[in-house]
Structures are given as C-alpha cells and as structure tokens.
Amino acid sequence: MESECLELNKRFITYNTHQRPYIILKWAQTANGFLDNEGKGMAVSSAFTKMLSHKLRAENDAILVGRVTDERDHSLLNVRDWYGKNPVRLVIDRHHPCFDGLDFSKGKAEVLHQIMSFLYINKVQSLIVEGGAITHQSFLDAGLWDEIRIETATSKFVKTGTEAPRLPHDVKPISHAEYDDNVIDIYERSRH
C-alpha cells in the first residue's frame, strides 16, 4: 500500500521534497538507437503511441525542448490526440529565454537549475523533457530526472543520425509495453 501511495503522489512529493518538478525524460528512437535520420526529424511513433504521448502531456504541467529540436520539428508540444489541458511549453534558447533573468553565462547545469527554480516558484509540479539529445544529456549529467520513457520503433533503422542518450547506471526498469512495432520502456532511479 505504501508503494502505491508513493506512486500516486510522486509529483507532489518530488515538488515538495526537492523543490523542483518531477522530471520525465522522454524520447523516441529507432531500433538501432538514433533519434533522427542524418539530422533530419522523422516520425518514430505510431498513431497509437503518439496518442499515448499526448495523454502523458495532458497529465503533466509543463513540457520542455531545446532550441535545435524546436527549430527542426516545429512541434506544438500540445494535447491534440487526447483530451485535457495543454502543458506549459518551454524552449531552452539563449537568444529567446523562456523567462526573464535566465542567465546562460554559467553553463548548462546552472541554466537547468535556474529553470527548475523558476518552475518551482510558479508551482509547476511535473515536467516532460522531450528533446533533443543535447538537452536530454544535460538533464542526465545534472542528475535532474526522476523517470525515463523510451519509445523504440523496433522495425525502423537508419544509417546515421543523432544517437539517443545513454541510460545512466542508476536506472531500474519499471515497465515494458509492446504496441505493434513499437516498444515503450519506462525506467526510474534505483533506490539503494
């Protein structure tokens, strides 16, 4: 019963304990571990897994991508294939900061901590990070993550592209689901 309560309240608990949102890193990759095809965006999700992605967006307060992903994909980052409230859309871009006072002069980790503080102050309890590779790796390197969701298109291969981030060593698989030719794996931090 205790584990069910913790799962149900994980966003609230993380927000109040760590003074930051609960962070979900989410990406879709090819069977051979690429996020794109030679730097060009491509559809990896099926219609069904795209709908699941929009459901996840509706369940969380904010969504974040890096500048390159935003410029390449022009994604609306909203809830189109599900119902519910759109998450707050954030883009990490030094030329167009997502809020006043964001200081890029101190490095990636500090920028992420500034964003987490901003989200905490604005009562954002949950954040999905949808890309790209540099942004995901920055969150991983800073230890700013609670859950990782990876969708793999098991029958899609590309010759070259942007490699998917590497999973950290302190992960524990918590879910594996197959949907036609796509698989969604969910990981959380190992509790020692």
Predicted regions and their residues:
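Enzymes that bind and transform nitrogen-containing heteroaromatic metabolites
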Residues: 7-192
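Active-site loop-to-helix "anion-binding N-cap" substructures in soluble metabolic enzymes
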Residues: 1-7
